[in-house]
């Protein structure tokens, strides 16, 4: 097995501060104003779908849009469930490669059948998706060699947070850099512990972080992993908790008064709890079995969540290497999925 720094996935994870800074340094205004549309749909597959959900959350909260993230395949096979003919509607189509079949087809249906305006978002000029949209947003700086999406996710998400009027996203690169230096060794140590199951939890913006964290672990390790909204997990899914379970809770300051109760409840059911968050109550941090705690001078939870994604990416990488997997080329996966 190669050394850690010989994997392109590792290089792309630790390059995130520089990639994000480079993207933010050259951003201009969005080519279209989402607030001028009655309906805004965002679509993609895999990580691009979770990226869409993250952006929809931020736009609804900070711009007042009526945005919804929908899998590309749903728009292809069930368009009338989502498209509303007659609305002034906008579709943002996300695909890292620009060659994901479902996403390109969804964009074409939106234009040809629904009369929507389409923004194509990808990393490759001249790709299939790049040629379809009325507007194009290109991120060639974060073209990735690895099958799994890491720095491209962070950089594109950061750009859209900036376009959500969250200027503080410009503060993230040095904060992420500092965290990588401080926490990498502990993340690697955590990856050596054998847990029977891993569940990521988060609320608000952190729910989208939990989903992307879950996908990174599934992709790189091939192991079953779950993601839920923090409080929804208590309504049925908590039945799976037992000794040998790890609950990785991304704590949201907006529901900080209930974090201690959540942690205690999961521990009472036999699970270990790792809590990660910014400016969280000391009682919650002390109650958890382990924690990654930050004291960042940030105002918005959407920015905080993006700043913590690298922790889950690193965990997935180190866990995969520990299991003898190749995180650059995970089993059963390809870089581009075509239908």
PLM regions: where:
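Conserved phosphate/anionic-ligand binding catalytic regions in large, soluble enzymes, centered on
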Residues: 6, 54-55, 212, 309
